[in-house]
UniProtKB/Swiss-Prot annotation:
Disruption phenotype: Morpholino knockdown of the protein causes a small liver phenotype. Morpholino which can simultaneously block the translation of leg1a and leg1b, causes a more severe small liver phenotype with hypoplastic exocrine pancreas and intestinal tube as well. Residues 1-22 form the signal peptide. Belongs to the LEG1 family. InterPro entries: Leg1. The keyword Signal applies. One of its GO terms (cellular component) is extracellular space. This is Protein leg1b. Detected in all tissues tested, with the highest levels in serum (at protein level). At mRNA level, only expressed in liver. It is found in: Secreted. It comes from Danio rerio (Zebrafish). Keywords: Developmental protein, Glycoprotein, Secreted, Signal. One of its GO terms (biological process) is liver development. Glycans are attached at residue 70.
Length: 364
C-alpha cells in the first residue's frame, strides 16, 4: 500500500471512530434543551382570547410536556423513588432525540431551511417533518387533555394552539376540536389523566398501581401514534425508503411496548433511545451495515425492521400473539425486560422472540 493509501485508510478509521457513536438524547441527564423551556404558561403569549401556544417552536412544545410531567409527579410514587421515574419522561426525550437526529427538519430535497436544527433561532419544528407531525399527537393532545381534566392548571385561560394554515387539515387546535376529530384518542388521554389521582390513592399495592397507570398511559400513547401515522403519512413521500421503513417499524414497536406497559423512566427511556439512529437514513443505508452508525444503532434498526417485516408477513398476528402473552402484570414485567434485551443487546438472538411468546402464552 502506498503512503497516500495508508494515510487515507487511517483517516477513514479515525472518521469512523468519530462518527460511530450512540445518539445523544440528553443534556446533563435531562431532555435536550429542557432547562430552556419555560415551566408555566406565564412565559407564553397571552391575549384577550387565551394563551397562544405555538407547538412549531421547539421550546413551546417542550413547555407543554414539562407542565404535564411536573403536574403528574405527585401521582407517580408507585413508579419508584424520585421524579425521574415518571413514565411520561419518554415524551420529551423522544422530542429531544428527534431534534438531535435531524428528524424535525424540513425533509424537502435541496431545502435551504434551517428549521428543525439547533442552529435555528428560535429552534423551530418543520410542519413537513414526519416525526414532528407524529410528535404533535404525543404532546399537544395529552397537554390539552391534562388541562381539560384540571391536572395542569390553565390559570383560567383558554388554550389556543397555533397551526400553520397550509397544514391545518392534519391537526386539531383545541380540546373540543381534537375531541371532534379524534374522539378515541382524546377519550383515552382524558381517562388517563382523570384516573391518575384515583389509582394513586387506592389501596392497591404499588406494583398493581404502577401496572394500572402504565396501562392507561400506553393505551393513550398507542392510540395517539396510530392516529398520527394516518394523519402524517403524506410526509413520508419526502424521505428515503430506509427512513420510511424505520418510521413504519417505530410505529410497530409502539404496539409491543404498549402491550408490555413499558416503564419509560428517564434513565430507561434515555438508554433505549440512545440506540436509535442518530441521523436521518439515506437510500444507500442498509442496516446492520451502516458504517457511520454504531453497532448498537445498527442492531436496533435491524431488529425493528425484522419485527415489522415478520408482523406484516403474518398479517399482524405477531403483535396479536405478543398482546395475548402480556396477560398479567408479571408477564408484562418480563416482557419489558425482554424488549430491552432484544433491542439493546446486539448479542441477543432475535429468534428467541418466538419461544418467549410461546412460553409466556402458556402461563396465561
Amino acid at each position: 500500500m502506498s503512503e497516500m493509501g495508508f494515510l487515507r485508510s487511517v483517516a477513514a478509521v479515525l472518521l469512523l471512530a468519530v462518527f460511530s457513536h450512540a445518539a445523544v438524547v440528553t443534556e446533563n441527564g435531562l431532555p435536550i434543551q429542557w432547562r430552556k423551556a419555560p415551566s408555566d404558561l406565564s412565559h407564553l403569549p397571552i391575549s384577550n382570547t387565551g394563551v397562544q401556544v405555538n407547538p412549531w417552536v421547539y421550546s413551546q412544545r417542550m413547555t407543554m410536556l414539562k407542565m404535564v410531567i411536573n403536574a403528574t409527579n405527585a401521582y407517580m410514587s408507585s413508579m419508584g423513588p424520585g421524579e425521574q421515574e415518571n413514565p411520561l419522561w419518554s415524551l420529551p426525550l423522544q422530542l429531544g432525540w428527534k431534534l438531535k437526529s435531524g428528524r424535525l427538519a424540513d425533509p424537502t430535497p435541496d431545502s435551504s431551511s434551517t428549521c428543525g436544527s439547533e442552529a435555528s433561532d428560535p429552534v423551530c419544528i418543520s410542519p413537513l417533518s414526519f416525526f414532528g407531525c407524529v410528535n404533535y399527537y404525543l404532546s399537544v393532545l395529552p397537554f390539552l387533555a391534562a388541562v381539560e381534566t384540571g391536572v395542569v392548571s390553565s390559570g383560567g385561560h383558554q388554550m389556543l394552539i397555533q397551526v400553520p394554515a397550509e397544514v391545518a387539515q392534519d391537526y386539531c387546535s383545541s380540546y373540543s376540536d381534537c375531541s371532534t376529530k379524534h374522539p378515541n384518542t382524546m377519550a383515552k388521554w382524558h381517562l388517563f389523566f382523570q384516573s391518575l389521582r384515583q389509582v394513586s390513592q387506592s389501596k392497591e399495592s404499588d406494583f398493581n398501581k404502577k401496572d394500572s397507570i402504565l396501562g392507561l398511559m400506553w393505551a393513550a400513547e398507542e392510540e395517539s401514534i396510530q392516529t398520527a401515522s394516518g394523519a402524517c403519512t403524506e410526509r413520508q413521500k419526502l424521505y428515503s425508503s430506509p427512513e420510511v421503513s424505520f418510521q413504519q417499524s417505530s410505529v410497530n414497536l409502539g404496539a409491543f411496548i404498549s402491550a408490555a406497559h413499558y416503564h419509560a423512566s428517564i434513565e430507561r427511556s434515555g438508554k433505549f433511545m440512545s440506540h436509535l439512529p442518530s441521523r436521518v437514513l439515506q437510500e444507500a443505508d442498509s442496516p446492520p451495515n451502516i458504517a457511520d452508525l454504531s453497532t448498537e444503532e445498527n442492531h436496533a434498526l435491524y431488529m425493528l425492521s425484522w419485527m415489522n417485516s415478520i408482523n406484516q408477513l403474518l398479517g399482524g398476528s405477531l403483535v396479536d400473539l405478543w398482546r395475548k402473552a402480556m396477560c398479567s402484570a408479571q408477564a408484562r414485567e418480563k416482557g419489558q425486560a425482554f424488549l430491552d434485551d432484544l433491542i439493546l443487546d446486539p448479542k441477543f438472538p432475535g429468534s428467541s422472540l418466538w419461544s418467549i411468546i410461546c412460553v409466556m402464552s402458556t402461563s396465561c
